[in-house]
Amino acid sequence: MSKINKLEHIRNIGICAHIDAGKTTTTERILYYTGKSHKIGEVHEGGATMDWMEQEQERGITITSAATTCRWQDKIINIIDTPGHVDFTIEVERSLRVLDGAVAVFDGVAGVEPQSETVWRQADKYNVPRMCFVNKMDRMGADFYRCVEMIKDRLGAKPLVIQLPVGIEESFKGIIDLVKMKAVIWKDESLGAEYFEEDIPADMKDKAEEYRAKLLDMVVELDDAIMEKYLSGEEVTEEEIKRLIRRGTISAAFYPVLCGSAFKNKGVQPLLDAVVDFLPSPIDIGIVKGMEVSTGEEKDFPISITEPFSALAFKIMNDPFVGSLTFIRIYSGKITSGSTVINTVKNKREKIGRMLLMHANNREDVKEASAGDIVALAGLKDTTTGDTLSDMDKQVILERMEFPEPVIELAVEPKSTADQEKMGLALSRLAAEDPSFRVSTDHETGQTVIKGMGELHLEIIIDRMRREFKVEANIGAPQVAYRETITKACEIDYTHKKQSGGAGQFARVKIIFEPLKEVKDLKDEDKNKTFVFESKIVGGAVPKEYIPGVEKGLNNIRETGVIAGYPMIDFKATLVDGAFHDVDSSVLAFEIAAKAAFREGMPKGNPKLLEPIMKVEVITPDEYMGDIIGDLNSRRGQIQSMDPRGNAQVVTANVPLAEMFGYVNTLRSLSQGRAQFSMIFSHYDQVPSQVADIIKAKK
């Protein structure tokens, strides 16, 4: 990390795209030409350097963002490889959070595909400046100009064409650089390492002039002095054009569009030049939002090497050689191995051991890293994704990443007792790596339940459990967590007596059960509870020491409701009277009496079955609105709102979780894969009686 590691020399970029647009191949070529990779890895042979997990090599899709450092000209480029499959959008969100700029790769044949829209919208959310690389220009049916139109129409973005392709499909051999007004042609025999500049071919002169004029019209708008010069017929210099393209890219006034064929090794070096010339350095971003721990005040912190140390942990990975690795993006200050920092989210100290610069699957030890760097730390104890590491004296919490709630759950059981312990360890490791994956235990069945972002997501988790941790497990079908409640108040007076020889048992309880929403004087601390117990015993009708027995009995018994055995929620139990016996009463006797009172009382409270209702948000192009709303209505959904966002529509609806299984596939087919959805738990609501009858029958 020599002195070229100045902030303006760093580019932290992501390469994001739809699955199969050629993103991994593009990254591979970048590594090859920047001298980090000695052999070109081909994805379709399962050998790419970036795709280093076994499943990725088999499926040919990128799952884990591996962070790689390489150099071009005198700049350091940190590349975060992002997955392109919809079930891994969490990985994309996570990497976009720590990037300064991105290259969106499009398939020259397919154009803007559905996942490209999703990733583009996520990049909008984090205000990531980006440029577009239209790839696969050598393929049959590739059409650069159609692709540019799709960027405009489908993404609602403003493309700035800075290159044109020379030759089409098989005869694609280079590009026209509209800034220099030169053609750049590659020599096939040198694996794309050698290329030369020449004059623009005569048959492309007119097109080049037309697009050059469009380019100038767009960029001069950013600078009044240059605009005047341009309008008065003076020549705008190459330097001025580059400076304006950079300014417009960083402010998202437009998105430069380049083209090439990564697989055929054409167009990669100009893409690297453009990354260096047009994408922002950490200095251009300038600030990071956060909170000062001492004051609790939200403020903007400068990105600078001279400020106190702060970094965001954005990825945790299990490395077969080093163990657990925490990838961090350093926003300010510097860090040395051996120093101690604080995790401000958990308020725990962390000692920095090994610090690694990662190159896909190779690693290089470093002793010091500073603002702008992306490094991996080995052996952190308490840090998880989204945590902030900070200087001990000036503590900050950087803006936390928001992770969507998982939308699908499955029960898993280990196949043998030997697998039991291994499975617990495997699942907790995987959950630490991936915040969109959750593990819990079902109180009713004792089963382990795993939750994730989609079927492919959970499939891959189960696959990793088998491969990396050697755990064999049986997988159940997706389930819904129903609940029960009462809808009217009732009062029960119950006496528990057992006096046949030896020590007897005696307890009398009088309990009022009522729905929580009907309780008038509910205390503030009880407002978010699903069960409230209160004792109004006066004059010692039930001695103080027996009252916890009543509460414990009710708490245990409410886990199995009276309709279909689901937990009872949203009710209050008030102990108003009772009686005891000097010899035969005990805590246990009152516990038994409370349970019996519950069983007797609940059927009188007009019990109802409840189901989880999800808040579903669907983002769709206009033309599919009708079908999507019709489908949501058929799922017992209630439409809450419809709003335009960019050139898409956002439909918000409340839909029962039970009706949402398999929705991702329905939505894909209704919208040709162009709509996307997210859902989070909203509330519990009563199940319609005809549906409740079916659920009871299944129990």
Curated annotation (Swiss-Prot):
Descriptive protein name: Elongation factor G
Role played: Catalyzes the GTP-dependent ribosomal translocation step during translation elongation. During this step, the ribosome changes from the pre-translocational (PRE) to the post-translocational (POST) state as the newly formed A-site-bound peptidyl-tRNA and P-site-bound deacylated tRNA move to the P and E sites, respectively. Catalyzes the coordinated movement of the two tRNA molecules, the mRNA and conformational changes in the ribosome.
Binding positions (GTP): 17-24, 81-85, 135-138
Family the UniProt entry places it in: Belongs to the TRAFAC class translation factor GTPase superfamily. Classic translation factor GTPase family. EF-G/EF-2 subfamily.
Any Gene Ontology biological process: ribosome disassembly
Listed HAMAP family: EF_G_EF_2_B (MF_00054_B)
Gene3D superfamilies attached to this UniProt entry: 3.30.230.10, 3.30.70.240, Elongation Factor G (Translational Gtpase), domain 3 (3.30.70.870), P-loop containing nucleotide triphosphate hydrolases (3.40.50.300), Translation factors (2.40.30.10)
Highest taxon of source: Bacteria
Chief localization: cytoplasm
Residue ranges of domain tr-type G in the record: 8-283
Gene: fusA
Protein's cellular compartments: Cytoplasm
GO CC aspect terms: cytoplasm
GO molecular function: GTP binding; GTPase activity; translation elongation factor activity
Keywords: Cytoplasm, Elongation factor, GTP-binding, Nucleotide-binding, Protein biosynthesis
